[in-house]
Amino acid sequence: MKKISTPLTVQMINSLKSGDEILLTGTIYTARDQAHKRLSDAIKKGKKIPVVLRDQIIYYCGPTAAPRGKAIGSCGPTTSSRMDEFTPLLLSKGLRGMIGKGRRSEEVIKAIKKHKAVYFLAYAGCGALISKFIQRVRLIAYKDLGPEAIYRLEVKGLPLIVAIDSRGRSIYN
């Protein structure tokens, strides 16, 4: 398994190939449908957004509350296609990676290639297991969205699979 850390660099991303298994360490951000809509709307209106996207990763996840003594509750991946309408814009603003589950649209694949990004798969159905790789959690924005708010996660050795690499090659083909 390859070990990578955030922030992502173009050189690092270009070294990844569809199907590679990786262990990710560093900072990632959670965001689902409603957070993506708010980010997108703010960008379109020229407003400042609450997170710097450049070279960062968004995990499509809505974590549950943390049990006593844990950093986070269950935090499995959300179906990525739900974010497809917002993804090209976020990639154009410097977002470098996404974590989720399932296929992506052709428009997203083209944007991944254009902006030298990468799409990772998290293991679906393993939300409780994934939580063991998360060391710290901090609310960043949109508290009113509850689990769909944007959280900053500090992860160590999070196992992922490269689903779509920076050349647009997909494990689904």
In which residue ranges do the predicted regions lie?
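Active-site/ligand-binding-proximal alpha/beta "capping" segment
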Residues: 87, 161-173
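Short, structured beta-strand/loop micro-motifs enriched in basic residues and often containing a Trp
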Residues: 1-8
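Feature captures the catalytic cores and cofactor-binding loops of soluble hydro-lyases/lyases
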Residues: 30-31, 35-158
